[in-house]
Amino acid sequence: MMKTEPRGPGGPLRSASPHRSAYEAGIQALKPPDAPGPDEAPKAAHHKKYGSNVHRIKSMFLQMGTTAGPPGEAGGGAGMAEAPRASDRGVRLSLPRASSLNENVDHSALLKLGTSVSERVSRFDSKPAPSAQPAPPPHPPSRLQETRKLFERSVPAASGGDKEAVARRLLRQERAGLQDRKLDVVVRFNGSTEALDKLDADAVSPTVSQLSAVFEKADSRTGLHRAPGPPRAAGAPQVNSKLVTKRSRVFQPPPPPPAPSGDGATEKERGPGGQQPPQHRVAPARPPPKPREVRKIKPVEVEESGESEAESAPGEVIQAEVTVHAALENGSTPATTASPAPEEPKAEAVPEEEAAASVATLERGVDNGRAPDMAPEEVDESKKEDFSEADLVDVSAYSGLGEDSGGSALEEDDEEDEEDGEPPYEPESGCVEIPGLSEEEDPAPSRKIHFSTAPIQVFSTYSNEDYDRRNEDVDPMAASAEYELEKRVERLELFPVELEKDSEGLGISIIGMGAGADMGLEKLGIFVKTVTEGGAAHRDGRIQVNDLLVEVDGTSLVGVTQSFAASVLRNTKGRVRFMIGRERPGEQSEVAQLIQQTLEQERWQREMMEQRYAQYGEDDEETGEYATDEDEELSPTFPGGEMAIEVFELAENEDALSPVEMEPEKLVHKFKELQIKHAVTEAEIQQLKRKLQSLEQEKGRWRVEKAQLEQSVEENKERMEKLEGYWGEAQSLCQAVDEHLRETQAQYQALERKYSKAKRLIKDYQQKEIEFLKKETAQRRVLEESELARKEEMDKLLDKISELEGNLQTLRNSNST
């Protein structure tokens, strides 16, 4: 899985919850100035690491049920000699930073890590124990019975004056911690810090440390104070630390100091051999008593799994706090010799009360799981550094609930909270007091634990409406992928790009890298696969191959599918605004390698297809026929007959180790890897089957198409023969038409000649007609002239006749007469 880095101050906001203020409040406290970064954590371990505060708190619970072996003389001597000359020192243990939420918690590794850490912390808690220890029962009793037996074996403590002094000292430390608003893990002890440094170096929390500030701000710091605990029997229960503890401080008037009669107190504070340990001889002076600080441990919503689900309801919220006053001393049985009671052992009262209170609280909410017992060699080794009873381990920390808590990165939320300026979260502002426990009637004198009757503070919780984050429709896998992508985007260089989308598009192709959610792998994002030469992106030059598309026109492409991203790009128009993420120079990009492999694979497939097409072309040129099915079956599509599938290959360069030689954590990790490989292999097999089925269907379709093509070829041959006959007839018809055309052309030419001759004749006739008309006109004019002359002559003759007739008449008349 991809390892994520903490989010910077400018990252996108996460969803809100009622506990967000408290969740963000303790973030700054989790970052002391000397805290190592996540890169300084040990990377050689093959399995997951867990938070140092979780293991220390857990180991303190485990030490209450862990049997301490007989101390070696050399080890005990070294511890007693070392205590007087070492001065009280405060060591600040840095808490690891939050890591990915998708890292699964390995419970078997958690048990083993808890055991190894408890061995180291037992150096602060261990005390010399009697050589004879009761043997563990073959069948362990129930959780409540074991806890009650544990309480009954404890020895009550006296002397409240020194308790008040220790409480005053702890109160000063708490006030100092509130001033600098740091959530520290302060360990004050006599001796070297070698074991503690080693413990801090091995502690890295990917998941649980993110829950360490869920319910309180740094004002109301939470922790567990306890002193080196007494050695336990081998069969004592080892409790689980899957519990979020809450501590509130109330001041109570100091009780009257007990009567100094006491051989009892002296006998309780002596060692097993009846002599006082040498650590008691160097007790420093104590200040006058002040009001005592009472610690109360409140279990908040314990989630159980496995056997605990049958015993207690999961998610049970215990609202009532029980203030338990307990006095647990290191001695196992009181001795008979009496000596003056020293003041030094009295300083253990308050821390041991808290330890007993934590055990009493565990009766309600903690499952009955038992961690592996420590080996005798490890117990002897832990006894080599022995510390005085004044050595106080002050652990102020939170315990986590396990994996998949749904939290966010701590540093980013703290920075966002500082920017928003939200008021500090006060979880104890709405508390009420209810009557406490009633007085016990006739308590057993042998019982070493007593319960307080003080009022119980009940704190108000959030209502369902306030706590409802409305996440019913949220897909956990999609949210996880989005979270991983958001963390990955923070490591990229982000820059905006604006492109003008032309008629040919944006000129880029995208690819969605990452396996499916059913395999449990995160998605990697939407990347630029290719840049089209001459396109808009190529002309702009800022978008390159392997770039991550974070946003397009304000639409986030983080944690989306490739089809959704493609639809977003298709729906863009005009000027398109991109937010591009690019790997910083010098960083090794796995995504770039995957995209390069995909491009090479596609190029190789294209070359193979071109070769096959070229082979088909050669076969057609040589034989003029199509390749047969046998040729297709014999010709391999890919080298070795394997189909190339675009899936993620897991690293298989690890040597196969024998299960006997491997540790359980490595076996579990190897098993998870094999599960992932098996899931990937199954996906490949399913994809191969689907491809094979599709190829078989395509092959059948090709055969049907081939038969249809052969039938169509036969039909086309018949049609060609018919067309050839038609073509011959058409040719003969064309010849006849050609002859007729020639004849027609000859006739046309003859007619053309006749027409031209007729035209000449017509012209001649017209010319003659014109001449005839001219002659006729001339003759008519001559005729008219002759008629006029004849008419004139006729008139002259008529006149001459009339004249002659007159003359004749005259003659007759004259004759007659």
UniProtKB/Swiss-Prot annotation:
Region (Disordered) location: 1-52, 64-163, 216-451
Main localization, broad class: cytoplasm
Region annotation Actin-binding: where it falls in the sequence: 1-154, 164-282
CDD domains registered for this protein in UniProt: PDZ_neurabin-like (cd06790)
Biased composition (Acidic residues): 410-425
An individual GO BP term: cellular response to peptide
Bias (Low complexity): 332-341, 399-409
One GO cellular component term: dendritic spine head
Motif (PP1-binding motif): 447-451
UniProt biased composition (Basic and acidic residues): 290-301
Compartments reported by the entry: Cytoplasm, Cytoskeleton; Nucleus; Postsynaptic density; Cell junction, Adherens junction
Compositional bias annotation for Pro residues: 131-141
InterPro entries referenced in this protein's UniProt entry, alphabetically: Neurabin-1/2_PDZ, Neurabin-like, PDZ, PDZ_sf
Record-linked Pfam families: PDZ, PDZ_5
Post-translational modification: Stimulation of D1 (but not D2) dopamine receptors induces Ser-94 phosphorylation. Dephosphorylation of Ser-94 is mediated mainly by PP1 and to a lesser extent by PP2A. Phosphorylation of spinophilin disrupts its association with F-actin, but does not affect its binding to PP1.
Residues with PTM Phosphothreonine: T193, T207
Domain (PDZ): residue spans on this chain: 496-584
Annotated positions of the Phosphoserine modification: S15, S17, S94, S100, S116, S192, S205, S438, S658
Region (Interaction with RGS2) location: 480-525
GO molecular function: actin binding; actin filament binding; D2 dopamine receptor binding; kinase binding; protein kinase activity; protein phosphatase 1 binding; protein phosphatase inhibitor activity; transmembrane transporter binding
SUPFAM superfamilies the UniProt entry points to: PDZ domain-like (SSF50156)
Chain's role: Seems to act as a scaffold protein in multiple signaling pathways. Modulates excitatory synaptic transmission and dendritic spine morphology. Binds to actin filaments (F-actin) and shows cross-linking activity. Binds along the sides of the F-actin. May play an important role in linking the actin cytoskeleton to the plasma membrane at the synaptic junction. Believed to target protein phosphatase 1/PP1 to dendritic spines, which are rich in F-actin, and regulates its specificity toward ion channels and other substrates, such as AMPA-type and NMDA-type glutamate receptors.
PANTHER family: NEURABIN, NEURABIN-2
Assembly information from the UniProt record: Possibly exists as a homodimer, homotrimer or a homotetramer. Interacts with F-actin, PPP1CA, neurabin-1, TGN38 and D(2) dopamine receptor. Interacts with RGS1, RGS2, RGS4, RGS19 and ADRA1B, ADRA2A, ADRA2B, ADRA2C, CDKN2A, PPP1R2, RASGFR1 and TIAM1. Interacts (via C-terminus) with SPATA13 (via C-terminal tail). Interacts with DCLK2. Interacts with ADRA2B.
UniProt name for this protein: Neurabin-2
Species of the source: Mus musculus
Gene behind this protein: Ppp1r9b
